Swiss-Prot record:
It is found in: Secreted. Residues 1-30 form the signal peptide. The keyword Signal applies. Pfam families: KWL1 (PF24300). This is Putative ripening-related protein 7. It comes from Oryza sativa subsp. japonica (Rice). One of its GO terms (cellular component) is extracellular region. Keywords: Secreted, Signal. Belongs to the kiwellin family.
Amino acid sequence: MAAAAASTKIVAVVVAVLLAILEMPSCAVARRHHHDHHDKPGHHDGGFPAVMTVNGFEKGEDGGGPAACDGHYHSDGELIVALSTEWFAGGRRCHRRIRITPSEHGRRGGGGGRRAVEATVVDECDSRRGCKDDVVDSSPAVWRALGLDTDSGEVRVTWSDV
C-alpha cells in the first residue's frame, strides 16, 4: 500500500510539473504581447516622438510605388500616413488610425491650427531603404488639417494609436 501511495504522489507531481511547463510559454507570449508598443524606444505615455515629413501618395509622385497596406495609390487629399519600419510593425498598423500632435516648437512651420489630427496608416516608410527610424511620412492633407506649411519639409510631432 505504501508503494501505491508513493507512486500516486510521483504521478501527481509529474503531472503538475508538466502542466506548469506547458503553461509557461503562453504566459511569456501574453506578457510580450501586452507590452508590445510600450517597450519600443522613445515611447512615452503621451505617444511616440517623431519627425513628420511630407509624402505624395499618388501615382508618379515622390512617394514611390503603391501603398504597402493595400497595393493602391491614394489621393493626397486623404488623411493618410506611412510609418517607419519598426512602427509599421510588419503591417499590423495597416488601416489603423493614429493621432498626430505637433510639438509646440514644431508649429513654427506655418503657425498651426488644430492641435491634433487623426490619420490612417496605409504605407511603410522603409527604414532599410533610407527612411529614418522616427518618421511619420504624411499626406499634404494631414499638414493642411494641422494648419502647417508643407514647405517647411518636416516638423516635430508626437503620435499615438487611436
